[in-house]
Amino acid sequence: RNAAGDFEIACEEPAAAPAGATPAAGAWPPRKRHGLSGPIEEAFDGPFVVVTGTAGNDDEDRRLAAQVERWADEWDRFADGRPPVLLDSQVTEAVIARRNLVLFGTPESNLILARLHDRLPVRIGPQRYEVAGKTYEGPDLGMVLCYPNPLNPQRYVVVYAGALYGERCGINHKHDLLPDF
C-alpha cells in the first residue's frame, strides 16, 4: 500500500511472450480464427470437461480433487450448472474430439497435461513456471493458460496449475477476466 492506503502494483518486465511472425497454415500454434481466437471465456462457451490429475502422490491428488471440487462449485454458482468432471484416466479420444479440456495439475500430476505439455508455450513444474525464457517460482503462485489443444486443434485446453486464480474476485468476474492465447 502507498501512503494513501491504496494498493500499487509495479511490474518491471511483462510476463507475456513477445509477439512473433504469423504462423503459416498448418503450423503450430494454429492461426486465430472464429471459434478459436480467445479470450478464455470462449473455451467455456462450448462443451467442456474439467479434468483432475491422478498421477501425483496421494497428497497431490487430494489437493487437486479439492481444487476441482471448489472450482466446479464456483462454476455452478456462476453459470447455474455444474460442469462435468473426469479423472485424467477417464479421458478418451472421443472426449478430446468433442470437448474443450479444463485441466488441473502439472505434467507430473495430470496424465493429459503430460501428453501435451511439450507443445504448450510455457513450462510448468512444481511451484514454478517458465514463460518466454523467464522463470517464476514460489509456493503461492498459480497459472491459468488458455491455448489451442495440441491433441485437437479445433478445441481449447485450459490449464490451472498451482494456487487457484481469483481468490478475491467476485463470482461474476472470476471466469471472464482472463486473457486469451
What are these regions (language model features)?
Residues R1-F181:
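Solvent-exposed alpha-helical segments and adjacent loops
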